[in-house]
Amino acid sequence: MGEVQREKVAVIIGPTAVGKTKLSIDLAKALNGEIISGDSMQIYRTMDIGTAKVTKAEMDGIPHYMIDIKNPEDSFSVAEFQERVRKHIREITERGKLPIIVGGTGLYIQSVLFDYQFTDDAGDVIYREQMEKLALERGVEYVHKKLQEVDPESAERIHANNVRRVIRALEIFHMTGEKMSDQIEKQEKELLYDVSLIGLTMDREMLYDRINLRVDLMMEQGLLEEVEGLYNRGIRDCQSIQAIGYKEIYDYFENRASLEDAVSQLKTNSRRYAKRQLTWFRNKMDVTWFDVTDGEKTSEILRYIEGKLQVKSNNSK
């Protein structure tokens, strides 16, 4: 029997503010593609400005998926993301189109492309509740330290403030005796799709300037009012509010920071996030990088995808 033909997928990754949105739409037009957002926060409705969500005008008629599918108070997991995106890939391919995943949330994108398996069981609820209680009583750093003791690699990757994921890693070790980082390493070996993995990068100072300008533009567009709307709805300890762009402005509404300091912190956190994104992609994924410091590389990237996936663009007919 011949080898089963794998579905073709183009993936565009890179740090925040590097120019992924425009490139993805240009490529979708040229390659008869449809776009799947690979951003873990653009799934939330009414959180448009702070997540730099693509607008209807920017979409220019290109179908987009995994945007506005949850309310801000809803939780969302990597496992659900994986399941939904794989379904979209299948359906887009069946329509004779090319799925194009665009985004910056490394683990989410990786979970789709590789053989990541998430347990369906509820886990150890009693153990999880014990850890949640410890986090409340003794602080998140205490629970993070427990993870460092049993799984230092996961502790390095998961920030102490991401309590849910810290506890999940502890729970996996408690239940299986196996480190979450070891499980992930096993699952990172084989791609499930025929993938063209494109990364955009640019001069760091230029990128940081773009990030600072983007934050200023967000404030002009009404980020303060957007966050105030969420705050007034009583949305507090939700996964969505941990997003950069929201937690900083929440500090202002809760009188923990002046507006000037909150905006400054937002810029700092965005720059740090961009740096972490680049580190993740370089360490974890086999990316072909294109430096866009001196301008767009759309034609060059298009030619690369055509060769890698053996597809034809509208331009090459």
Swiss-Prot record:
Taxonomically, which superkingdom? Bacteria
One example of the protein's molecular function in GO is: tRNA dimethylallyltransferase activity
Q: Which of UniProt's keywords are assigned here?
A: ATP-binding, Magnesium, Nucleotide-binding, Transferase, tRNA processing
Name the enzyme's class.
transferase
Q: Can you state which reaction this protein catalyses? A: adenosine(37) in tRNA + dimethylallyl diphosphate = N(6)-dimethylallyladenosine(37) in tRNA + diphosphate
- Record region (Interaction with substrate tRNA): 39-42
Q: Which InterPro entries match?
A: Dimethylallyltransferase, IPT, P-loop_NTPase
Binding-site residues, substrate? 16-21
GO biological process terms held by the UniProt record: tRNA modification
Needed co-factor(s): Mg(2+)
Tell me which EC number(s) this protein carries: 2.5.1.75
Q: Which residues bind ATP?
A: 14-21
The site feature described as Interaction with substrate tRNA is recorded at: 105, 128
Q: Which PANTHER family has this protein been placed in?
A: TRNA DIMETHYLALLYLTRANSFERASE (PTHR11088:SF60)
Similarity field:
Belongs to the IPP transferase family.
Q: How does it assemble?
A: Monomer.
Function, as annotated: Catalyzes the transfer of a dimethylallyl group onto the adenine at position 37 in tRNAs that read codons beginning with uridine, leading to the formation of N6-(dimethylallyl)adenosine (i(6)A).
Name this protein carries in UniProt: tRNA dimethylallyltransferase
Q: Which gene encodes it?
A: miaA
